[in-house]
């Protein structure tokens, strides 16, 4: 009887191992179809459930000059995925009573002249429902290449109109997240980067993530690339593409290793409370098909996170990052304790098509 039970257990284990190998092979096919040249710009991919690795692969080059290969220690520009870190900072300050998410922008920016800033709250800027238009001077090439979180929002001082009443619609806009840089500094008296390092990154156990500065050394730095008209790869990041210097909305460089630490800190409530997490993962506004950025069926926006609810599927919480040649997906399924990280140094890919294929392979 005991021998029979052992034989059954062994057979079941073998079947599970065989299934895991098949799943990994199917996922490999998806990524190998895109990253099929080891000497071209590449990507890092990690899928974990709990502490178990479902899939982990690195492809291609992080730097085409030095020929450094992509690894899980490679620091990618995660672009707009940076927004969730800034949102967590504001929620920490709300937890401490330093500010309220219902505080109006006029409390922190008395220099903003229009009366409607009294009606726009921190909740609105974190959920992309403020109505503030993106009126940055994009025709000024020097501005878009080298502006920072302060200069990028100067147009709001004399802004005289909104695109819609706050809280009534969704419009994805980077400058409202850039405001968080000054809100943190004005509310705490602490430089933004210092606050983030001590209260967010260190608490999460993140070791090498850094905000971009032109003269700052970042270990294992990846570069983004695009193909030129001759089909050759050329670098396309700072100096070639806009707004690499704005920190609160998009200038964080982070590795897969550090992002796993971040996800664990979010899951285990080490950087926020469970109540704050529920707020962040709540879809405050549904994204309509005519939205310029972020629409997917069944998707809304929380605080720094897209939240997708589809019939017969578990809820997906994620964000996208796009800047220069970098194309980033940082997603999770909280109820399954599953994370899916896909960081790429090239943009010529169908990112969400790839993501959806992988979720389908995983029956998610």
Where are these regions (language model features)?
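Short, glycine/proline-biased beta-turn/loop segments that scaffold the active-site neighborhood
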Residues: 100-115
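Short, surface-exposed loop or secondary-structure junction motifs
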Residues: 63, 117-320
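Short, well-ordered beta-strand elements
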Residues: 316-319, 328-332, 336-346
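Short, gly/Ser/Thr-rich active-site loops of penicillin-recognizing serine hydrolases
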Residues: 285-290, 343-364
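Bacterial Sec-dependent N-terminal signal peptides
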Residues: 1-18
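Short, conserved catalytic-motif segment at the N-terminal edge
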Residues: 19-76, 100
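A short acidic/small-residue loop/turn micro-motif
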Residues: 60-64, 243, 347-349
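Active-site SXXK
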Residues: 31, 45, 51, 75-102, ...
